A protein has these predicted regions:
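Acidic, metal-ligating active-site segments
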Residues: 18, 23-39
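Short, ordered loop/turn segments at secondary-structure junctions
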Residues: 85-86, 113-114
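Structural motif
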Residues: 78-79
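Two-metal-ion RNase H-like nuclease active-site motif
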Residues: 10-20
Length: 152
């Protein structure tokens, strides 16, 4: 079913994680009625007392446990937007988005604020008067993946 030119994917969540000075993390999720995020349904947070240290290329080890906690008991999700890459290189090495797709079984869009050293494949997206691009990748969305790879 299409809604406003976008596929209806059901409840969508955008998530992010903030790291605490104590070594823990706070994850936040915004739930929306559709992929346009025009109608917000709820907000949630979860705190983890400890998380893994950052390792380049292994970001998911640090980020996925807090995301798991904030998304717990949300069986109606149809789309997840994460702060990071779905895949880390053109060969498809899995990043946070691919790991989240495998974990939750739903399509994931990865939106990264900086270019990862091996990520030569994402299309930089600039919005409005911004000069800093966002780098978009996806997992579990073959049509979007083809569109991103083609530069459309």
């Amino acid at each position: 079913m299409e809604t406003g030119g976008r596929p209806d994917c059901g409840v969508c969540a955008a998530v992010d994680v903030h790291y605490l000075r104590t070594g823990g993390a706070r994850a936040a999720a915004v739930l929306a009625a559709d992929a346009a995020f025009a109608q917000m349904l709820a907000e949630r947070t979860a705190v983890m007392p400890r998380v893994q240290p950052y390792q380049p290329g292994e970001f998911y080890l640090r980020e996925l446990p807090p995301l798991r906690a904030v998304l717990e008991d949300l069986s109606e999700l149809g789309l997840l937007v994460v702060d990071g890459y779905a895949d880390l290189d053109p060969a498809g090495r899995p990043g946070l988005g691919a790991r989240a797709h495998a974990e939750f079984g739903i399509p994931v869009i990865g939106v990264a604020k900086s270019r990862f050293r091996t990520a030569t494949h994402p299309v930089p997206v600039v919005r409005g008067s911004s000069v800093r691009p966002l780098f978009v990748t996806s997992a579990g969305m073959p049509a979007l993946r083809r569109r991103i790879w083609s530069g459309a």
